[in-house]
From Swiss-Prot:
InterPro entries: AP_endonuc_2, AP_endonuc_F2_Zn_BS, Xyl_isomerase-like_sf, Xyl_isomerase-like_TIM-brl. Residues 152-164, 175-188 have a biased composition (Basic and acidic residues). Zn(2+) 2 binds at E367, D401, H438, E483. Mn(2+) binds at H404, D451, H453. It holds the Pfam family AP_endonuc_2. The keyword Lipid biosynthesis does not apply. This is Apurinic-apyrimidinic endonuclease 1. SMART domains: AP2Ec. Residues 144-188 are annotated as: Disordered. Plays a role in mitochondrial DNA base excision repair (BER) pathway induced by oxidative stress. Has apurinic/apyrimidinic (AP) endonuclease activity towards double-stranded DNA (dsDNA) with a preference for C as opposite base. Has 3'-phosphatase activity; removes 3'-phosphate from blunt-end, recessed, and gapped DNA templates and thus, removes 3'-blocks for DNA polymerase activity during BER. Lacks 3'-5' exonuclease activity and does not cleave damaged bases by nucleotide incision repair (NIR).
Amino acid sequence: MPRHCCCFVFHFLLYMLLINIVKNNIITAFSHRHQALRERKNIFSNSPINYIYYLGANKHIYSKFSSVCEQKKLAHKKIAIKKWGIERNEKKKFTISLNNYNKIQQSKFMSKMVKENKASTKNENKCSINNTQDIRNFMNLKKEEKDEECDEKTKQDNNKENIKNETIVQKKKIDKNNKTKEKIKTKSETNKNTNITYPSIPKSIEKRWADYKKIIEYAKSTNVYLGAHISASGGVQNAPINSFNVSGLAFALFLKNQRKWESPPLTEENIKQFNENCKKYNFDKNLILPHGSYLINLANPDKEKREKSYLSFVDDIKRCEQLNIKLYNFHPGSTVGMCSTEQGIKNISDCINRAHKETSNVIIVLENSAGQKNSIGSKFEHLRDIISQIDDKERIGVCLDTCHTFAAGYDIKSYEKFEEVMNNFHNIVDSKYLKAVHLNDSKSDLGSGLDRHENIGKGKLTLDTFKYIMTSKYFKNIPIVLETPDITNDESVYKYEIEYLYKMCAKEQ
């Protein structure tokens, strides 16, 4: 046999031996793993504690398997990954099994404790049954003691009530004379609390004319001209009609939308109908008091904003000239906290002087304010200082609002105090500048600084306040305009208040 054939046979045998060795190692590894899994299942089913020892004792199985893979460089990476996943899942299962095992032990322990407690409670119940009669007797004694105490307290309370009743009877005998005085004092207060029913405006024109003629007779005898701030919806020409319906001899109105900067101008038809209605119902145009827009603030230190207010201000005055109205009332304004009151007063007076030059004959009327923060006009001195800086003194005046006056700190609740306030006004401002009155009751207290109007007889002011206005020399032949809330929503409240005030004035005379 040749030499090279022998070498080939030798190498072939060696190669076959190596293959058999590798196969045997792999088979043994898998067989060991299979056995390990079976043992793990058996051990895990018995108790989780034995499984701990199993994991520690059989780590060499996986190390052998991995070493074989590394030595032979086989492409079994997936097998290694599966091995790692098996270990992780086994650990999770082990933790779950431990938790379950602990819960089982706790439940067994608790069941033992419950059994022991039941046994103890049975013994206690036997003892308690014997003692229940003693406890009931003890509780009955306590109840009897409490009942006795309650009886004593009721007797004491009855004695106290009898003593109080005796003292009240004695006080009634003593205070008979004082009661009559208190009744006289509280007459005005009871009038405030009574629910007043306001009659509606008559539907027939004849009845309206009859009521209107009665008011004219009152006005002629007293020289007091009452009216209200009435609606001008649908056009200024409707204002005289609405004033006639409430029996007003004077009235106030807005010549345009009081909450907008721009409004359409008056048409020739508006002006014509307004003049015709004033003649029809015998209105004196000297007793008409238009009210300026709420947006106007001539005291504003900002030049642009003050100019915007001024243009609206002058537009109102020119509308008064178109309607041949002689008075125009407005709120002086506020410093807005951006300048001093002196500077605000100067801004107001400069705007009025400028408006006088651009218009002809309308008298600009300053309304006193309630004393809100930064407002100008709450003090008589403010009004005096504005008037002192006006060039044309014949075209400036003042409107006193009773609610604002009271809220600003001037006490006008009694006849005597109102007289003092008006004398003070005469000395500081001069009563010749008093051109109009806004007649309102006040919801707010004296000196509160709050502008809160109320219906006549329902606020903080007294009937003496309104009697003084109806009879005092300071308020003759000027427009006295109600600005009370229209609680009836049809202005019939103004008709009632006008008639009420005139009748009160007639009784005083």
